[in-house]
C-alpha cells in the first residue's frame, strides 16, 4: 500500500512539473507580447535573457554525473554547437517576431507541427524511410498531413468568433498598453514567420541528434548552446539596430521583469526537462506539448483579451491529432527497433527532446 502511495506521489510530481513547465513557457510568450507593446526590443530581450539563463545553468556543470568518459570538446564539436546556436538564434528571433505579429495561441499551435516538419526533413535527408507496409510509417505520414492541414487552417482561415473575451480590469493588460490583437494581414505574416521558425527547430533537432551522439553530455551542450544564442542575437541586434542604440538600455518596468523572468524560467525549465527525461521516456514529455494550445487560449483570454476564432479552434484540433499520430508512429517504430535490435543503441530523432528550445 505504501509503495502504491509513493508511486502515485511520484507520478503526481512529474505531472505537476510538466504542467508547470508548459504553463510557464506559454506565460513567457504572453508576457513578451505585452512587453513589446511597452517598447521592449526583441534583440536585447533575447541577448540578456539567454545570457542570464546560461549563467544560472553554469553551476549545474559541477553537480552533474561525470562518471562516464567523454571525448574532448574538439573544434569540430564546438563548431557544430556554434551552428546549433545560430539555428537556435534564428528560431527564437523568428518566434519572437511571429508572436509580435500574431499571438501566443497561434505560436503554440504552429509549434506543434514541429514533429511533422522534422519527419519531412528526415525523409528528405534520408534519415527516415517511408514504407506503407509498416503501421508506424503510415501513422507518421498521416499525422504529418493532418498537422500541415491544421497549420494551413489556423493561418489562412480566421472564421467567426466562437468565444468573445471578457476579462476583469485588474487582469487585463490592455489597460496598460495599446491594443494587442492582430489584424488579418498581421495574422498571416505571423503564421508564415512561425512556420519558418518550425523549420529552424526541425533542422536544429536533426543537428542536435548528431551532436549528442558525438558528445553525450546534455548540460554542457545546452549551456554552450544557450550562450551562443545570447552572443549571436547580440551581434544581429547590433547590426540590425545600429542606428538605435537606446534599445539596449532597459528600464525598471515590465521590460526588465520580462527579461529576468525569461532568464530564470528558461534555466528552470531546462532543469525540469532534463530531470523528467532522465526518469521518463521522451514520449512522456511530448504528450504535454499540445496542452500549450489550450493554455495559450486561456491566458490570451484572461490577460490579452483575445477572442477565440473558429479557424484557430479547428486548426488546433487537427494539429493536436496530427501531433499525437506522428508521436504514436515514432513510438511504435522505436518499440519495434528495440525488439529487433535489442543489442544496439538508437538515438531517436522526433522523440529526442533533451534540449527542447525555448
Curated annotation (Swiss-Prot):
Annotated Gene Ontology cellular component terms: membrane
Sorted UniProt keywords: Membrane, Transmembrane, Transmembrane helix
GO molecular function: transmembrane transporter activity
Superkingdom of source: Eukaryota
Protein's membrane topology: Multi-pass membrane protein
Cell location: Membrane
Membrane-spanning parts: 12-32, 42-62, 81-101, 105-125, 137-157, 187-207, 219-239, 245-265, 283-303, 308-328
SUPFAM superfamilies: Multidrug resistance efflux transporter EmrE
Broad class of the protein's primary localization: membrane
UniProt domain EamA: residue ranges: 27-155
Annotated family: Belongs to the drug/metabolite transporter (DMT) superfamily. Plant drug/metabolite exporter (P-DME) (TC 2.A.7.4) family.
Protein name per Swiss-Prot or TrEMBL: WAT1-related protein At3g28080
Organism: Arabidopsis thaliana (Mouse-ear cress)
Amino acid at each position: 500500500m505504501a509503495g502504491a502511495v509513493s508511486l502515485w506521489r511520484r507520478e503526481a510530481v512529474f505531472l505537476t512539473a510538466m504542467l508547470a513547465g508548459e504553463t510557464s513557457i506559454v506565460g513567457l510568450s504572453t508576457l513578451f507580447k505585452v512587453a513589446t507593446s511597452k517598447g521592449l526590443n526583441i534583440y536585447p530581450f533575447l541577448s540578456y535573457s539567454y545570457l542570464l539563463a546560461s549563467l544560472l545553468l553554469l553551476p549545474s556543470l559541477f553537480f552533474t554525473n561525470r562518471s562516464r568518459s567523454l571525448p574532448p570538446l574538439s573544434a569540430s564539436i564546438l563548431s557544430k554547437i556554434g551552428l546549433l546556436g545560430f539555428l537556435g538564434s534564428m528560431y527564437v528571433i523568428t518566434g519572437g517576431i511571429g508572436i509580435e505579429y500574431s499571438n501566443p495561441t497561434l505560436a503554440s499551435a504552429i509549434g506543434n507541427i514541429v514533429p511533422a516538419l522534422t519527419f519531412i526533413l528526415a525523409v528528405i535527408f534520408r534519415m527516415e524511410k517511408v514504407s506503407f507496409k509498416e503501421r508506424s510509417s503510415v501513422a507518421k505520414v498521416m499525422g504529418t498531413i493532418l498537422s500541415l492541414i491544421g497549420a494551413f487552417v489556423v493561418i489562412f482561415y480566421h472564421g467567426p468568433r466562437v468565444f468573445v473575451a471578457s476579462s476583469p480590469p485588474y487582469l487585463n493588460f490592455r489597460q496598460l498598453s495599446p491594443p494587442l490583437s492582430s489584424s488579418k494581414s498581421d495574422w498571416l505574416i505571423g503564421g508564415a514567420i512561425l512556420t519558418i521558425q518550425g523549420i529552424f527547430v526541425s533542422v536544429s533537432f536533426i543537428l542536435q541528434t548528431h551532436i549528442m551522439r558525438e558528445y553525450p553530455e546534455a548540460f554542457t551542450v545546452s549551456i554552450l548552446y544557450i550562450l551562443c544564442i545570447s552572443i549571436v542575437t547580440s551581434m544581429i541586434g547590433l547590426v540590425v539596430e545600429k542606428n538605435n542604440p537606446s534599445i539596449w538600455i532597459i528600464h525598471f518596468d515590465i521590460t526588465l521583469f520580462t527579461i529576468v523572468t525569461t532568464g530564470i524560467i528558461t534555466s528552470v525549465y531546462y532543469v525540469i526537462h532534463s530531470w523528467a527525461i532522465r526518469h521518463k521516456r521522451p514520449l512522456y514529455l511530448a504528450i504535454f506539448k499540445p496542452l500549450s494550445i489550450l493554455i495559450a487560449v486561456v491566458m490570451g483570454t484572461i490577460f490579452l483579451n483575445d477572442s477565440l476564432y473558429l479557424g484557430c479552434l479547428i486548426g488546433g484540433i487537427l494539429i493536436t491529432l496530427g501531433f499525437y499520430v506522428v508521436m504514436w508512429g515514432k513510438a511504435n517504430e522505436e518499440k519495434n527497433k528495440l525488439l529487433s535490435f535489442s543489442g544496439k543503441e538508437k538515438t531517436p530523432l522526433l522523440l529526442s527532446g533533451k534540449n527542447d528550445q525555448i
